[in-house]
Amino acid sequence: MTTGQRTIVRHAPGKLFVAGEYAVVDPGNPAILVAVDRHISVTVSDADADTGAADVVISSDLGPQAVGWRWHDGRLVVRDPDDGQQARSALAHVVSAIETVGRLLGERGQKVPALTLSVSSRLHEDGRKFGLGSSGAVTVATVAAVAAFCGLELSTDERFRLAMLATAELDPKGSGGDLAASTWGGWIAYQAPDRAFVLDLARRVGVDRTLKAPWPGHSVRRLPAPKGLTLEVGWTGEPASTASLVSDLHRRTWRGSASHQRFVETTTDCVRSAVTALESGDDTSLLHEIRRARQELARLDDEVGLGIFTPKLTALCDAAEAVGGAAKPSGAGGGDCGIALLDAEASRDITHVRQRWETAGVLPLPLTPALEGI
């Protein structure tokens, strides 16, 4: 008689930045994000008998084959050297998430059992990323699935914190806003923690104590959706790298300059005003703040020359403005997606905007806010 195989499945939604990009990477600066109804799914099961010497087997619908890993000094090492560098690069966020959950288990006197993990993504199409936060979503889903598989009962905040630690180990410059949107779902106001502080704390006192400690700068709260506005999303077909754009900005002398200070102050005021508009149901003020956010990103682009606004993103914004809406790049810009807020009752205007987008080479994405996170 054989026992049934244990299987845990977790789904994490993608995200879009509504306002606060670039400024949010500094701890305590606010941003608004919304989770969207395309998900990444992570399935964790007991290891098959034929996995051989592998402790963990990871497969993804974005990768060519399953890759076996084994534990060595708390880290996962590729079993087959031929898979090495490519596998670690392609699966970096999944691996870091498993390792971070493993650290927590180790501190509690447990270990990660042998398992197989598979990733299925609707944040891509034909291998192309839409820019909906796939790295964040897969990290959040992996943390949740592996933790549940190992019997860890974690609060929503603890799942976010584990995902933040896993992500910061790979790149401490990322704000974690994508992780928060995937974790809580809906519309959120977000402030990033000091990643250098929390990484150092985890190395000094361990993951378990770090989960319970105060995190300077960090805040998340749910927001109501706009009352009479619909969120429209357009994809430029031009993939952008948030990490490289943010890194480029970090390398420039702009950081710490008077221009940088003005950008952060104006963006912070804009985001706080937009939060107030959402909480009071003031759609007119919200549209005004989205326009301000676009203008501030345009000023940053003019001063620093990052390439935030591509011709397609500019056309996307102009089409929405022409019917009285408000639009801007979502996230780091340079490609990927733009968002527009339009009168939800003006169906002809919405159709007109979508048609203008298509003429400009922008693909309207059939997305709606995901009300629940993972």
UniProtKB/Swiss-Prot annotation:
Enzymatic reactions: (R)-5-phosphomevalonate + ATP = (R)-5-diphosphomevalonate + ADP
Pathway as given in its UniProt record: Isoprenoid biosynthesis; isopentenyl diphosphate biosynthesis via mevalonate pathway; isopentenyl diphosphate from (R)-mevalonate: step 2/3
Cofactor: Mg(2+)
Coiled coil feature spans: none
GO molecular-function term, one example from the UniProt record: ATP binding
Keywords of this entry: ATP-binding, Isoprene biosynthesis, Kinase, Magnesium, Nucleotide-binding, Transferase
EC number(s) reported in the record: 2.7.4.2
Matching InterPro entries: GHMP_kinase_C_dom (IPR013750), GHMP_kinase_C_sf (IPR036554), GHMP_kinase_N_dom (IPR006204), Phosphomevalonate_kinase (IPR035102), Pmev_kinase_bact (IPR005917), Ribosomal_Su5_D2-typ_SF (IPR020568), Ribsml_uS5_D2-typ_fold_subgr (IPR014721)
Family designation: Belongs to the GHMP kinase family.
PANTHER family in UniProt: PHOSPHOMEVALONATE KINASE, PTHR31814
Assembly and oligomerization: Homodimer.
Function statement: Catalyzes the phosphorylation of (R)-mevalonate 5-phosphate (MVAP) to (R)-mevalonate 5-diphosphate (MVAPP). Functions in the mevalonate (MVA) pathway leading to isopentenyl diphosphate (IPP), a key precursor for the biosynthesis of isoprenoid compounds.
Protein name: Phosphomevalonate kinase
Organism, scientific name: Streptomyces sp. (strain CL190)
